């Protein structure tokens, strides 16, 4: 996986775990040592040999599980259709997802450092685990002399967000420079000349909206396809528009939502974006679909139920409940139908392994 340049370097993740066997010297790993001891034990014909083999088998299995889980914990982001996606999304705790090549962040949770370099921030709704880090995000950009960010919010919360920032300005006696944009459903905002954003309707317990980021391409109008280059130049010089502007949905982000957004025909672009970043708060039968819907969230079973509507190349699942471990998430996702599973990536940063 390609790594994305970052303004900040994060400290290495320390994982605590029960040592299975004493550390060996030199280049031998604990895993190799266990394997060697198992091989040695297999030649032991004395009493109790089979018991020792059984213990070592269990330790080998534990070690393999630990190595897999550690690899999952250390993975800081994912690659999807040419886009590096970095983020953390733990249900009820914090959500912030960035796509650095597009210079965008979605939601700002606790204001993680990896989001600070993104100039454009899209807020889906006003719950603290999605917006709580906004003042710190703005302040940190100022601290590092980065230009004021552009922050997009649902129109119904703009005044409250501005009031919140004013309170922090008074308390902190700092400027908190920001361009705050109320972006409504049906509106389009140009991020740069080849990139635009549009919100779409989501369904949560408070007013909410998702966002689609589109690439902008221009194609010669059909009626001019037979003309030579010099003729097209003359038309352009005369003021004629010779191209059509076509928007291609690249990345969509839902934030918190029920599955109702899937069935809304106005959200077709979100369901055909190359990459859809959506939520799956609940994964198993400990919590049923009715409970998920009552709290404005999705159950993994609903993603399976509606899988025929997803035209995305990759679906990144986020916002799992903190009740789940890395192993719980992996096992639940692996139970999806093969065709759907081939599209799914689980964003598991922030989740613990049973072996850590």
Language-model segment annotations:
Residues 2-45, 234-353:
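Cap/insert and terminal regions of metallo-dependent hydrolase folds
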Residues 26-120, 209-213, 219, 244-254, ...:
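Conserved beta-strand hairpin/beta-sheet module of binuclear metal-dependent hydrolase folds
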Residues 107-153:
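Active-site metal-binding motif and surrounding structural segment of the metallo-beta-lactamase
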């Amino acid at each position: 996986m390609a790594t994305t340049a970052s303004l900040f370097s994060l400290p290495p993740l320390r994982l605590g775990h029960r040592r299975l066997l004493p550390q060996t010297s030199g280049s031998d790993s604990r895993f190799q040592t266990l394997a060697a001891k198992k091989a040695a034990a297999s030649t032991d014909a004395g009493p109790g040999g089979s018991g020792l083999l059984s213990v070592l088998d269990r330790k080998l299995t534990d070690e393999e599980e630990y190595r897999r889980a550690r690899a999952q914990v250390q993975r800081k982001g994912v690659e999807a259709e040419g886009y590096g996606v970095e983020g953390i999304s733990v249900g009820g705790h914090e959500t912030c997802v960035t796509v650095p090549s597009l210079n965008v962040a979605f939601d700002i949770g606790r204001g993680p450092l990896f989001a600070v370099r993104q100039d454009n921030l899209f807020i889906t709704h006003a719950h603290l685990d999605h917006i709580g880090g906004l003042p710190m995000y703005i302040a940190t950009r100022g601290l590092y002399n980065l230009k004021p960010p552009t922050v997009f919010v649902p129109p119904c919360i703009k005044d409250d967000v501005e009031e919140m920032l004013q309170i922090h300005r008074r308390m902190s006696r700092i400027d908190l420079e920001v361009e705050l944009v109320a972006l409504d459903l049906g509106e389009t905002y140009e991020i740069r000349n080849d990139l635009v954003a549009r919100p779409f309707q989501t369904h949560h317990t408070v007013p909410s909206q998702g966002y689609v980021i589109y690439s902008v391409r221009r194609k010669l109008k059909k009626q001019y396809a037979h003309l030579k280059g010099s003729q097209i130049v003359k038309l352009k010089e005369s003021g004629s528009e010779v191209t059509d502007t076509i928007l291609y949905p690249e990345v969509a982000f839902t934030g918190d939502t029920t599955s109702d957004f899937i069935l809304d025909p106005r959200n077709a672009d979100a369901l055909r974006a190359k990459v859809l970043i959506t939520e799956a708060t609940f994964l198993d039968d400990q919590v049923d679909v009715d409970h998920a819907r009552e709290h404005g969230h999705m159950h993994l079973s609903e993603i399976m139920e509606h899988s025929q509507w997803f035209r995305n190349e990759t679906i990144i699942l986020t916002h799992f409940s903190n009740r789940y471990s890395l192993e719980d998430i992996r096992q639940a996702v692996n139970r999806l139908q093969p065709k759907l599973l081939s599209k799914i990536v689980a964003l598991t940063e922030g989740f613990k392994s049973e072996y850590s």
